Regions:
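Helix-turn-helix DNA-binding elements, focusing on the entry/boundary residues of the two helices
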Residues: 6, 17, 28, 43-46
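Residues in the recognition helix of alpha-helical DNA-binding motifs
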Residues: 9, 23, 34, 63
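The alpha-helix within a helix-turn-helix
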Residues: 10, 21, 50
C-alpha cells in the first residue's frame, strides 16, 4: 500500500472532517492542524486514527508544516 496523509486516509474511508473529529473526540480545528502538519497527534490518538481509518501506522505520512 502507498503511504497516505491523514487527510487521504480519512477521505479513503469516506469520512468528512467533522465526522472524523467527532469519532476521535477532538475538535475540527485539531484534526485540521494534524492534517496540515501544524501539530501532530499523540500516540494514543494515532491508534484511534488507524482503527477509524482502517490503516496501519506504517501506511501513514505525518506532515510537518515547518521542518527544521
Amino acid at each position: 500500500m502507498a503511504k497516505l496523509t491523514l487527510k487521504a486516509a480519512r477521505v479513503n474511508v469516506g469520512l468528512d472532517q467533522k465526522t472524523a473529529a467527532k469519532e476521535l473526540k477532538i475538535s475540527n480545528k485539531t484534526l485540521g492542524n494534524w492534517e496540515n502538519g501544524v501539530s501532530a497527534p499523540k500516540p494514543e490518538k494515532i491508534d484511534l486514527i488507524c482503527n477509524l481509518y482502517k490503516v496501519n501506522y506504517d501506511d501513514l505520512i505525518f506532515l510537518v508544516a515547518n521542518p527544521l
